[in-house]
């Protein structure tokens, strides 16, 4: 049975929070390490991740990457450093 009332429900403080408590900008980097079957696949993956970073950035994202031949294939190691933690979180959601 639902409660019926003509008076609107007021909730002071509901759905509000201090953004500084969520994003303190201590963590602005994402390291990605994957092994691909071919160097071409690793390069395509790097291009994909780079484009996702470029789509998110408000200031240039610093990207350091290398592709190395390993026993199982080709290891892509990439470090994406954003200007703020909020951009990092958006990037993480877009690549998930």
From Swiss-Prot:
Database matches in PANTHER family: UPF0381 PROTEIN YFCZ-RELATED
Top-level taxonomic group: Bacteria
Signal peptide start and end residues: none
Name of a matching Pfam family: DUF406
Name recorded for this polypeptide: UPF0381 protein HI_0636
Family: Belongs to the UPF0381 family.
Any Gene Ontology CC annotation: cytosol
InterPro entries: DUF406, UPF0234-like_C
